[in-house]
């Protein structure tokens, strides 16, 4: 599971699953989307829950389970930008916080910047989205992060949403199965729950 998928979708579902099947033990591993999918393909996991974008692979059956929206976020020291529509070219003037270069999120935003004739140049690269939250909250830079990950900080005002002129495409949390691999009964029940076909 990727960290964003865990926090924005899976934890709540796992809680329901655990209530329904208290005797079933689950082993969760976390990583980037490419690493998580590589583990699935290698047969190390039964199932992957990741965020888009993902590379197409005929081995995989992909089910979109939830939409999530990234926002440009900054600490309260960027509150003067709140309510304005800032062009992406202006965003480049501020220190930028990003996930590491080996992530699909980095690739997504590198492409997003390039499509607007700009080059993505992060000042701080982090391994996980979870680490981005305190770095942004402390005012060390601005960065694109799923709204759901910073919901509490947005409500309390320690992080502000900075609107940009360019449209940020919505992303999805996906459940990915290996078409070749038979699933255990527990995995089949979990998949049904994730797809919303089993009562929570």
Give the predicted meaning of each segment:
Residues 1-3, 61-71, 95-101, 156-169:
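Short beta-strand->loop
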Residues 9, 162-200:
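A late-sequence structural motif
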Residues 14-21, 44, 89, 106-119:
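Ligand-binding cleft/hinge of the Venus flytrap
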Residues 59-96, 100:
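Flexible hinge/capping segments at coil-to-helix
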Residues 1-56, 126:
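Central regulatory/effector-binding core of bacterial HTH transcription factors
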Residues 80-82, 95-116, 183-187, 191:
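Secondary-structure junction motif
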Residues 32-37, 41-44, 51, 110-162:
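Hydrophobic hinge/microswitch elements
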């Amino acid at each position: 599971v990727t960290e964003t998928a865990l926090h924005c979708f899976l934890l709540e579902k796992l809680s329901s699953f655990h209530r329904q099947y208290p005797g079933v033990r689950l082993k969760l591993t976390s990583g980037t989307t490419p690493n998580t999918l590589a583990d699935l393909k290698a047969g190390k996991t039964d199932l992957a829950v990741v965020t888009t974008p993902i590379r197409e692979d005929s081995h995989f059956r992909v089910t979109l389970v939830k939409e999530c929206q990234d926002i440009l976020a900054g600490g309260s020291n960027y509150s003067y930008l709140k309510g304005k529509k800032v062009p992406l070219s202006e965003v480049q003037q501020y220190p930028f916080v990003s996930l590491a270069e080996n992530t699909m999120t980095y690739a997504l935003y590198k492409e997003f910047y390039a499509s607007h004739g700009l080059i993505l140049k992060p000042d701080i690269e982090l391994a996980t989205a979870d680490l981005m939250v305190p770095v942004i909250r402390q005012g060390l830079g601005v960065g694109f992060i799923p709204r759901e990950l910073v919901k509490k900080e947005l409500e309390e005002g320690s992080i502000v949403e900075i609107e940009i002129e360019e449209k940020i495409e919505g992303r999805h949390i996906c459940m990915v199965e290996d078409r070749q691999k038979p699933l255990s009964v527990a995995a089949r029940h979990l998949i049904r729950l994730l797809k919303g076909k089993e009562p929570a």
